[in-house]
Structure formats: C-alpha cells, structure tokens
C-alpha cells in the first residue's frame, strides 16, 4: 500500500485540529476558587481537578490572583468549587451571592467556628472534608425549581446585588463533624430579618419585607 500523500496528511491534520477546537468549545468550564496566604486564586478549569491539589490547579487551569478587598460580588450559574483552610474569606465570597451548584472542600485540619453563610439560589451542595475526616464526599439537593418557577424570577436587592428568593444558611461547623449532611426548609417566610434576628448580616444586606422567601438550613 502506498503511503498517504503530503496533501492527505495535511488534510487529516487540519480536520484533527478542527475537531479538537469544536470539542474544546463544546466543553463548559467550571470555576475554582482557592485561598492561600491572604490571597485568592480565581481559576477557570476545563476539567475536574483533584481536591486541594494547588499545583495541579495552577498547571491545568487558567488562574489569576485577586486580593480579598478586590473581590467583586457576582453570580455563578455553573459549577463553583471553593477550596479553603478557614472561614476568613468565605463570607466575602459567598454571602448573598447567587450560586446554583456549589462544592466546598476543606483543605486543612482546622476546627471551624459556628458561623453561617447565607447563599442565594443554591440548588445542589457538595462537601469534601477528607483532609479532616476519612469521610466520602457528600451531596445534597436543596431544591430543583426551574426558571419557570415564579419564585426564581430575579428580585434585585440593590444595584450590584444578586437575586435572592431562595436563601440557604450553611453552618460551617458541620465540617468539624463526621456525620451525614442534613437540611430542612421553611417556605413562605416574610419579614426575614425579624424572623432571624441573630443573623447580623441582614443589616448589611437588607431584605424587602414584602417578599416571600424559601429558607433552608444546612447542618
């Protein structure tokens, strides 16, 4: 059999590059954020990265360093993974931020305080605490409402703030326990600041009292 001509090889090579580009464009990148030494690394990853493997993340993902005070409140419609060693930056990253699919991975053996995060629109939560407990990754479905659900329609709290009709309160002390992830929800909650006076961040993020909320506690 005669070897393929140079023209055929060039055509095959071109088709291969085209197919690779189409495959890459078809992939949806996920966001990975990790905190180290008072800095935050915000990464866009085309593939899953092994939890807490900082070197691999820097190698395989497109990452940039962000100073904590420069972090802007945003929303995440896709997958968001956060690696953390303590809770110092989590409130700034997550409180009243719209996150639909969240994974939190503890990358240290630190004992975490009883501190609540308030997350908007959370549909699925995954947690990994293997650095502290030999416990498999856990997953919890919060709610599965679609865009057609009237409660999902955006309600803007303030310029630059995120729509927040579903609110999940996440107790960070759950990472200290080797027990199953649990939650319960309360529907049709009005005057949310009055019903939960111990949550001081409602003074920073005032919630309209004429709206109805679905509140979920995760512990």
Curated annotation (Swiss-Prot):
Any single biological process term in GO: mitocytosis
Chain positions carrying an annotated carbohydrate: 29, 42, 95, 188, 210
Keywords recorded for this protein, A-Z: Glycoprotein, Secreted, Signal
Zinc-finger is among the record's keywords: no
GO CC terms, sorted: extracellular exosome; migrasome
S-S bridge residues: none
PTM info: N-glycosylated.
Transmembrane segments: none
UniProt-recorded Gene Ontology molecular function terms: identical protein binding
InterPro entries xrefs: ECPIP
Similarity comment: family membership: Belongs to the EPCIP family.
Biological function: Likely to be involved with PKD1 in the detection, sequestration and exocytosis of senescent mitochondria.
Quaternary state and interactors: Homooligomer. Interacts with PKD1 (via the PKD repeats in the N-terminal extracellular region); the interaction is not dependent on N-glycosylation of either protein.
Full protein name: Exosomal polycystin-1-interacting protein
Annotated gene: EPCIP
